[in-house]
C-alpha cells in the first residue's frame, strides 16, 4: 500500500514539475510554441522525423512573432525571428550575448577549449591571437597546396566517367573526400590522398564524427543543451573516439615538426608560432616557429589539437556541402551556369591560363553563386548564443534573463520571403552591385559580429577551387525538371537525405 502511495506521489510531483517547466514562457510574458511535454520543440527529432536544425525551422514557420519562447526538451530557450533583433544580438548588443553557452572546460578538458566553445576573456584573447592566420597573404601562401588537391579531385572524376556520354555521380560523397584532403593538407600539412586511400586516418576520424549512433547523440545533446552533464561524462572518463584520435594525430604531428625543425605553410605552422613565440607573425613571408629563449610554451598541445579538430570538423562539412549544393543548383539553372563558366574561364585567362589565388579572387560571379548557396543551404542551419546579462527586448516590455539560450534559425530567415523575395529561387545576382534586393541583416551564413566564422574566407577559397576545377574540365548536364533537395534527419549540419546527384561528362 505504501508503495502505491509513493508511486502516486512521484507521478504527482513529476506532473507538477513538468507543468511548471513548460509554463516558463507564460510566466515570463513571452509568446511560446512547441509546448509538447517532455521534448518540446524537439519532439520530431526524438521520433526520427526531423534533424535538430529543421525542427527549429518548423518552429520558425509556425509563428510570425519577432521572438518566441520554446522548449529544447526541459530547457526553455528563445527563438529570435526578427532579422534586426538577431543582428543586434550578434553585433550591436554583443556584450549581452558574447558566449554560446555550450560545453567547455579549459582546465580539465583542454580539447574542449576550441574557439567555438570558449567563453569571455579567454575566447577574446584566443580570437585576437588567431585572426592573423586567415589573412589574404597567408591564404595565398597556402594556395599551391590547395590547388594540388583540386587536381586530385579532377583526376578522380575523370576516372569515373566514360570516354563518351555522361554519368551520374553522387557529389556530396565526392566533395567530402575533396574536403577531407584539403583540410588535411592546409591545416595539418599532411600529404593525404583519400581518393586513392579511402581508409586513411582522416577518413576514419570523419566516419567516427558522423556516426549518428546513440552515444554520439547523447554526447552532442549534452554538449549543446546540458553542459553540466557533459562535464560529468568527461569527469568519469567517458571518452569520444574521434576526439582521442584527433588528439593523438595532432600531438604526433606537433612532435614531429618541433623535433625535426620542419616548416610548412599551413595552419598548424601558425599555431606552432603561437605556441613557441606567443603570437602569429603578421609577416606573410615568415613561417618559422622557433621557441623563444626562455622556452616557455604559450599553448599546450591539447589546446592546439582542440583548434585543429574544430577547423577540421567545421571546414570539412561546410566545404563538402557548399560545393556539391552549388554544382547541383547550376544544373538546375542553365543561365547561371553559363555565367559561372564564363566567369571562371575569363579569370583564368586573365592570369596566364592558370588557376591562381588572384584568379580565384577575380571570380566575382562565382563568389555570388557561393553566397547564394550559403543562403539557401546554410551548412549550419542555426546559430546559438546565451544571454550573459539581462537584456530588455527593444520596443517591448519583455526582458531576456541572463542564462537564457538564444536560437537564430538561419534556414528560417534565409528562406523567409519577408527578407528574401522568391526565397527558393537561386539568384546569385542578389549579391552583385545592382542586386541587394534583400534584408542584409537577415543574411547570416557565416554568423556576424565578433564571433563571426574566422575561417569563412579560407572556406570560400576551397569551395571556389573545387567548382572552378569542375567547370573547367567537365560538362554538367542540365536537369530536365527542377527538384528541391530533401534533407536528412540526423545531426545539426544540413545534410542531403539521398546525396547530391549530378550528371557529368568529359569536356568536349
Curated annotation (Swiss-Prot):
Any GO molecular function: iron ion binding
Topology with respect to the bilayer: Peripheral membrane protein
Subcellular location: Endoplasmic reticulum membrane; Microsome membrane
PROSITE patterns reported for this sequence: CYTOCHROME_P450
Main location: endoplasmic reticulum
Enzyme Commission number, as recorded: 1.14.-.-
GO cellular component, one term: endoplasmic reticulum membrane
Binding site for heme: 453
Pfam families to which the protein is assigned, alphabetical: p450
Domain of life per record: Eukaryota
Cofactor: heme
Keywords tagged on the record: Endoplasmic reticulum, Heme, Iron, Membrane, Metal-binding, Microsome, Monooxygenase, Oxidoreductase
Main enzyme class: oxidoreductase
InterPro entries xrefs: Cyt_P450 (IPR001128), Cyt_P450_CS (IPR017972), Cyt_P450_E_grp-I (IPR002401), Cyt_P450_sf (IPR036396), Insect_CytP450_Detox (IPR050476)
Family (UniProt): Belongs to the cytochrome P450 family.
Reported function: May be involved in the metabolism of insect hormones and in the breakdown of synthetic insecticides.
Protein known as: Probable cytochrome P450 6d5
The encoding gene: Cyp6d5
Amino acid at each position: 500500500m505504501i508503495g502505491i502511495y509513493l508511486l502516486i506521489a512521484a507521478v504527482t510531483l513529476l506532473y507538477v514539475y513538468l507543468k511548471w517547466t513548460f509554463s516558463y514562457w507564460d510566466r515570463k510574458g513571452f509568446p511560446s510554441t512547441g509546448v509538447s511535454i517532455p521534448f518540446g520543440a524537439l519532439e520530431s527529432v526524438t521520433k526520427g522525423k526531423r534533424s535538430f536544425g529543421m525542427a527549429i525551422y518548423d518552429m520558425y514557420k509556425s509563428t510570425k512573432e519577432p521572438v518566441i519562447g520554446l522548449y529544447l526538451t526541459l530547457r526553455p530557450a528563445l527563438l529570435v525571428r526578427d532579422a534586426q533583433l538577431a543582428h543586434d544580438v550578434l553585433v550591436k548588443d554583443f556584450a549581452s550575448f558574447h558566449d554560446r553557452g555550450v560545453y567547455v572546460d579549459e582546465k580539465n578538458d583542454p580539447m574542449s577549449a576550441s574557439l567555438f566553445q570558449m567563453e569571455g576573456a579567454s575566447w577574446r584573447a584566443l580570437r585576437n591571437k588567431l585572426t592573423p592566420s586567415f589573412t589574404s597573404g597567408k591564404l595565398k601562401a597556402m594556395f599551391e597546396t590547395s590547388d594540388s588537391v583540386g587536381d586530385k579531385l579532377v583526376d578522380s572524376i575523370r576516372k569515373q566517367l566514360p570516354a563518351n556520354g555522361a554519368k551520374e555521380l553522387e557529389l556530396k560523397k565526392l566533395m567530402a573526400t575533396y574536403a577531407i584532403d584539403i583540410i588535411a593538407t592546409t591545416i595539418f600539412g599532411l600529404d593525404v590522398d583519400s581518393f586513392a586511400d579511402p581508409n586513411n586516418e582522416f577518413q576514419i576520424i570523419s566516419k567516427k564524427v558522423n556516426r549518428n549512433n546513440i552515444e554520439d547523440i547523447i554526447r552532442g545533446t549534452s554538449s549543446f543543451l546540458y553542459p553540466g552533464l557533459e562535464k560529468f561524462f568527461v569527469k568519469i572518463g567517458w571518452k569520444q573516439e574521434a576526439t582521442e584520435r584527433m588528439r593523438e594525430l595532432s600531438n604526433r604531428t606537433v612532435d614531429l615538426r618541433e623535433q625535426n625543425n620542419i616548416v610548412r605553410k599551413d595552419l598548424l605552422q601558425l599555431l606552432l608560432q603561437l605556441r613557441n613565440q606567443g603570437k602569429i607573425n603578421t609577416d606573410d613571408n615568415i613561417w618559422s616557429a622557433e621557441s623563444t629563449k626562455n622556452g616557455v610554451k604559450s599553448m599546450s598541445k591539447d589546446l592546439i589539437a582542440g583548434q585543429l579538430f574544430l577547423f577540421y570538423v567545421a571546414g570539412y562539412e561546410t566545404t563538402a556541402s557548399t560545393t556539391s549544393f552549388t554544382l547541383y543548383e547550376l544544373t538546375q539553372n542553365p543561365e547561371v551556369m553559363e555565367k559561372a563558366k564564363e566567369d571562371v574561364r575569363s579569370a583564368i585567362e586573365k592570369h596566364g591560363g592558370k588557376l591562381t589565388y588572384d584568379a580565384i579572387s577575380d571570380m566575382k560571379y562565382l563568389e555570388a553563386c557561393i553566397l547564394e548557396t550559403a543562403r539557401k543551404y546554410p551548412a549550419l542551419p542555426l546559430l546559438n548564443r546565451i544571454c550573459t546579462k539581462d537584456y530588455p527586448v527593444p520596443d517591448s516590455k519583455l526582458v531576456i534573463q541572463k542564462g537564457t539560450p538564444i536560437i537564430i534559425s538561419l534556414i528560417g530567415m534565409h528562406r523567409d520571403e519577408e527578407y528574401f523575395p522568391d526565397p527558393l529561387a537561386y539568384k546569385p545576382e542578389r549579391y552583385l552591385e545592382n542586386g541587394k534586393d534583400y534584408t542584409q541583416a537577415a543574411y547570416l551564413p557565416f554568423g556576424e559580429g565578433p564571433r563571426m566564422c574566422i575561417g569563412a574566407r579560407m572556406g570560400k577559397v576551397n569551395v571556389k577551387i573545387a567548382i572552378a576545377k569542375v567547370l573547367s574540365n567537365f560538362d554538367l548536364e542540365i536537369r530536365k525538371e527542377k527538384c528541391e533537395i530533401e534533407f536528412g534527419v540526423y545531426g545539426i549540419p544540413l545534410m542531403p537525405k539521398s546525396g547530391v546527384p549530378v550528371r557529368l561528362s568529359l569536356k568536349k
